[in-house]
UniProtKB/Swiss-Prot annotation:
Domain of life: Bacteria
Keyword GTP-binding listed: no
EC assignment: 1.1.1.17
Catalysis performed (reactions): D-mannitol 1-phosphate + NAD(+) = beta-D-fructose 6-phosphate + NADH + H(+)
GO molecular function, one term: mannitol-1-phosphate 5-dehydrogenase activity
Annotated residues for binding of NAD(+): 3-14
Similarity comment: Belongs to the mannitol dehydrogenase family.
Name of the protein described by the UniProt record: Mannitol-1-phosphate 5-dehydrogenase
Pfam families: Mannitol_dh, Mannitol_dh_C
Amino acid sequence: MKALHFGAGNIGRGFIGKLLADAGAQLTFADVNQPLLDELNKRKRYQVNVVGEQARVEEVKNVSAVNSGSPEVVALIAEADIVTTAVGPQILARIAATVAQGLITRHQQGNTRPLNIIACENMVRGTSQLKQHVFAALSEDEQIWVEQHVGFVDSAVDRIVPPSEAGSTDILAVTVETFSEWIVDGTQFKGQPPEIVGMELTDNLMAFVERKLFTLNTGHAITAYLGQLAGHQTIRDAILDPAVRQTVKGAMEESGAVLIKRYAFDPQKHAAYINKILSRFENPYLHDDVERVGRQPLRKLSAGDRLIKPLLGTLEYQLPHDSLVTGIAAAMSYRSEQDPQAQELVTLLAQLGPKAALAQISGLPADSEVVEQAVSVYNAMQQKLAH
């Protein structure tokens, strides 16, 4: 199995790339970080530190790397059996032209073996969005050919992979938690789905996408935002603070009530899933900074993302949402010198005031009760900070 993976960052190396390599794939990473690519090509292997109760070091072997901007990538797509990505939602649109060129070359070479493309991003149906960008760069004839021979498979991914420790001298080493979940839409494959241990097929992907978004992502973000407000440095410190934990757990229970209503999830199993996630946030071996987890607040406060989407569900089913609203107010309070979106958020709040700013960012009506509620919690948070 020939595999090409876009994104040789921590998630690429520590999660998706690792599962592909473990499955015996001939794996090539595509990235723009030249020193990283050079090192991968020199060593052809790297170490993954899996941390939890039982820490272990696993080696990933027989890998190579190419620059995403090079003609080699096009040639690899023309030959590959599987193409995966972990580049972040913003970059996904940027690699579409390269993917399209690879598919055109594949067509020209008469390669009719099935190819499956799986975007492994923190977004809802990311591969379908990638497909739209790719199709925009194809002629009608090419689109027809691609529809016949190429599967665009949506997925939900879940593994916490913090940045390397400061002082870690190995550019390739990566640390990951023990838990991992990669769920793919089994209905979207062309040909037989590849056998990859750790990749689960489902015919009801949206239930899993929203379960992860509404629980892990919602909880992680709110832990970061409340943690920063309370002066904590790491996610672990924040979630061990009883006041933070109470709101985070409350928010996950509120979003969970939406999932139980929408997808008929088993309430007890979902409660266990929430507890599992809380214990993952407590992992003493993952040093995950609240500032890092909170970054890109504008994206995280947008209509389809981890804070507003579950809130809209509570409104749809007339369910409680006080903790989610507190989380939204905390996100509005996020500050970071390193994050351009945090700077933009501050500007919007100053120019428009909190009410109009939240309405503009989230798409919620400015005169709605929830916006009023979020703004009043936000104002109280700001007053507390001022004292």
